Amino acid sequence: MRVQICAVGRLKAAPEKHLLDDYISRLDATGRGIGISALPVCEVEEKRRLQGSELMEREAELLLAAIPKGALIIALDERGRIETSEAFAKRIGTLRDSGAADLAFLIGGANGLAPALRERASHVMAFGAMTWPHMLVRVMLAEQLYRAVTILSGHPYHRA
């Protein structure tokens, strides 16, 4: 199963970018042994000066166009379900075992994800009730994906 993070906005060469790249590399190296690989992080950006719901809808179009066709969508949103790392790993393992080919994690921009995109997702998850900057959410998600594959493979990284 291929896993991709797709987000609105671009990360500059900064500590967050280095952390993201490191966790994606670890995810790919560890996950390959259990049938999970990482696709490059996808970044989309709307150049026109749109506002509010019009901007969110356009960002949703860009996100959907950027992910693999037929990918299962997991949306990150503050209204989503909060899970433990173990439950998240189990979800990833179940999706892999059910034959899912591609899994796309979508992160919205400053206004969040369009409601229609959240409804289209097979799962909506949150990293708590707080709002997080999209730069940090990418790193947090990449780390949790890496943690999930270490849990699934029995690697000692996760100590619960």
From Swiss-Prot:
Question: Can you name one GO molecular function term for this protein?
Answer: rRNA (pseudouridine-N3-)-methyltransferase activity
Q: Which UniProt keywords apply?
A: Cytoplasm, Methyltransferase, rRNA processing, S-adenosyl-L-methionine, Transferase
- Asked whether the UniProt record includes S-adenosyl-L-methionine among its keywords, one would answer yes
Which EC numbers does the record give? 2.1.1.177
Query: Where does it localize?
Result: Cytoplasm
Top EC class, one word: transferase
State its role.
Specifically methylates the pseudouridine at position 1915 (m3Psi1915) in 23S rRNA.
* Alphabetized InterPro entries for the sequence: Alpha/beta_knot_MTases, RlmH-like, tRNA_m1G_MTases_N
Give the catalytic activity: pseudouridine(1915) in 23S rRNA + S-adenosyl-L-methionine = N(3)-methylpseudouridine(1915) in 23S rRNA + S-adenosyl-L-homocysteine + H(+)
Positions annotated to bind S-adenosyl-L-methionine: L76, G108, F127, G128, A129, M130, T131, W132
Predominant cellular place of this UniProt entry's protein: cytoplasm
The organism's taxonomy opens as:
Bacteria, Pseudomonadati, Pseudomonadota, Alphaproteobacteria, Hyphomicrobiales
User: Does the UniProt entry include the keyword Phosphoprotein?
Assistant: no
Please tell me one Gene Ontology term that the record gives under cellular component.
cytoplasm
**Record protein name field:** Ribosomal RNA large subunit methyltransferase H
